[in-house]
Regions:
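His/Asp/Glu-rich metal-coordinating catalytic cores
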Residues: 2-28, 32-163, 170, 177
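Binuclear metal-ion centers of metallo-dependent hydrolases, dominated by the metallo-beta-lactamase
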Residues: 118-119, 133-220, 295-343
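Active-site-proximal loop/helix segment associated with metal-binding centers of metalloenzymes
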Residues: 88-97, 106, 110-111, 124-134, ...
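C-terminal regulatory/interaction regions
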Residues: 214-343
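Active-site-adjacent beta-strand anchor residues
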Residues: 54-57, 165-166, 274, 299-300
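Short internal beta-strands
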Residues: 52-62, 126, 184-194, 253, ...
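Short acidic low-complexity segments
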Residues: 11, 19-28, 73, 207-227, ...
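Short, charged, surface-exposed secondary-structure boundary motifs
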Residues: 31, 64-69, 82, 111-113, ...
Length: 343
């Protein structure tokens, strides 16, 4: 028998006292830990050496190490298969014994150099639900990029510089790639660090100037408009507030949350376009149908309402939500899990 639980560390799969944690939020005392990708909300600080065996991709491991997370060597175990989740470079879902599939953060849309997720058949599906509400339906990638290019073209015609805003790891590399035809292209130094890592793994990043070099060379003060790619944050933030005020730049944010108009106003952006590295609601339904599971567990975001909607569609779904002071515990019949000894 197999327990699927949510505790203070996150989602855990337990069989006869042997535990596998899925993207824990802090270091657990467990046999195995799966890290799906290198966003900081899926990484944990390794406080002590306790023999944790880490299952993750080489790319995720390298990016995590670069960001200051020390995990030692990664570990491969029979019965566990990493499958591209399409979220960011190196991101993976985990297929356990060909029967249980954990998505991690997932996208089934091809975006620039990012391939769509590989979704297997599985009896049990543990699926993220960040945008698991029917209100969150995204336009296709190409139309979003086209809209952004129209805005940039208009601003360049008027001599106005433009700031594109996206997450430092993942979104910013896509922005660097798809808007590389605009010159001069300037990239925030923190994004440049991630771009260099992507280049090491074969993703071509065309020539650009870092923000610090552009500032030193006085490029920002020239009469020629420029395009800056920077980490997404509120325009009330000191850096963006300074750039907008000094150079008269306009801002374009990219996020799945931009489906709602309040997001643009909350961050004080001039424009905001729906572009996400997650599945939208319809994509999540597509993942479920392709996986065709007997049992579904939803986690993160709209976990409860998404599970309810899946049940209305004829699936058997429950949210994995930790109740305060309690373990949300579910018994799963999957006797083959952890029955084989470690190699």
């Amino acid at each position: 028998m197999l327990d699927v639980c949510v505790d203070n560390y996150g989602i855990t799969v337990d069989n006869k006292g042997k535990k596998l944690y899925l993207d824990p939020n802090r270091q657990p005392d467990s046999d195995l830990i799966f890290i799906s990708h290198a966003h900081t909300d899926h990484l944990y600080k390794c406080i002590k050496e306790n023999g944790n065996k880490i299952i993750t991709s080489k790319i995720t491991h390298k990016i995590a190490m670069h960001r200051g997370y020390k995990y030692g060597e990664t570990f491969e175990q029979h019965g566990f298969e990493l499958l591209n989740s399409g979220h960011i470079l190196g991101s993976n879902g985990l297929l356990i014994e060909d029967q249980m599939y954990y998505t991690g953060d997932i996208s089934i849309r091809k975006r620039a150099f990012m391939d769509a997720a590989v979704v297997p058949k599985a009896k049990i599906l543990i699926i993220e639900s960040t945008f698991g509400h029917p209100e969150y339906v995204f336009p296709n990638f190409e139309s979003t990029i086209h809209k952004a290019n129209l805005i940039i073209s208009e601003m360049y015609h008027r001599g106005i510089p433009v700031i594109l805003l996206g997450y430092t790891l993942g979104k910013a590399q896509i922005l660097t790639n798809v808007f590389r035809h605009w010159k001069p292209l300037i990239v925030h130094d923190s994004i440049d660090e991630m771009n260099k890592l992507y280049s090491e793994f074969g993703v071509s990043m065309d020539s650009y100037v870092t923000f610090s070099d552009a500032e030193r060379s006085d490029m920002l003060s020239s009469r020629q408009p420029w395009l800056l790619i920077a980490p997404i944050t509120s325009c009330k933030n000191g850096f963006l507030k300074y750039i907008k005020k000094k150079y008269g730049a306009i801002s374009i944010g990219f996020s799945g949350w931009a489906v709602k108009s309040y997001y643009k106003y909350a961050l004080g952006l001039d424009h905001c376009l729906p572009l996400s590295d997650h599945c939208d609601y319809n994509d999540l339904i597509s993942v479920v149908k392709k996986c065709n599971p007997e049992k579904i567990y939803t986690f993160h975001g709209f976990a409860e309402s998404f599970a309810e909607n899946l049940n209305l569609l004829g699936f058997d779904a429950d949210p994995l939500i930790r109740k305060r002071g309690k373990r949300n515990k579910t018994i799963v019949k999957l006797d083959t899990f952890f029955t084989k000894s470690d190699p």
